[in-house]
Amino acid sequence: MAKKNTENNTLADNRKAWHDYFIEETYECGVELVGTEVKSIKNGKANLKDSYAEIRNGEVFACNMHVSPYKEGNIFNVDPLRKRRLLLHKSEIDKLLGFTSQKGYTLVPIALYLKNRRVKVKLAVAVGKKNYDKRDALKEKDARREIDRAMKNNR
């Protein structure tokens, strides 16, 4: 019997989210897709930049998640920016609702990946950074890079 591949294969990242937000918690959730969207995502035609999630009527939806139309999809293609339902347990949705009801918290998709041949979204509870926080993060990153460079040269 063949061994199942349980390795996560990242299809799209939202790198800007790490720059613009402090990530508090992450959740793994499924996403409701149409067949041609799955093919397009597997071809790497998804973009999470500027995407966010919102809770409406007890359901979580991903907004502004761009999935380019599948080129062989003809009439079966759907709107690239349509709202896609994210699949979570009710208790997780209630917890997320508690977070987002507080001021400053938002839900941001940070990764789109395959797990056991299913497309999953890594959803983060995030707090927006101020400009000075972003500058501090860049300074820390540069300092860390300098230290690593110095350590590498001393070997």
UniProtKB/Swiss-Prot annotation:
Where is this chain's protein located in or outside the cell?
A: Cytoplasm
Which Gene Ontology molecular-function terms are recorded?
RNA binding
Gene Ontology annotations for the cellular component aspect, listed alphabetically: cytosol
Specify the domain of life of the species encoding this protein. Answer: Bacteria
Q: Belongs to which family? A: Belongs to the SmpB family.
The protein's job, in short, is: Required for rescue of stalled ribosomes mediated by trans-translation. Binds to transfer-messenger RNA (tmRNA), required for stable association of tmRNA with ribosomes. tmRNA and SmpB together mimic tRNA shape, replacing the anticodon stem-loop with SmpB. tmRNA is encoded by the ssrA gene; the 2 termini fold to resemble tRNA(Ala) and it encodes a 'tag peptide', a short internal open reading frame. During trans-translation Ala-aminoacylated tmRNA acts like a tRNA, entering the A-site of stalled ribosomes, displacing the stalled mRNA.
Q: What is the name of this protein?
A: SsrA-binding protein
Its source organism is Clostridium acetobutylicum (strain ATCC 824 / DSM 792 / JCM 1419 / IAM 19013 / LMG 5710 / NBRC 13948 / NRRL B-527 / VKM B-1787 / 2291 / W)
Q: What is the lineage of its organism?
A: Bacteria, Bacillati, Bacillota, Clostridia, Eubacteriales
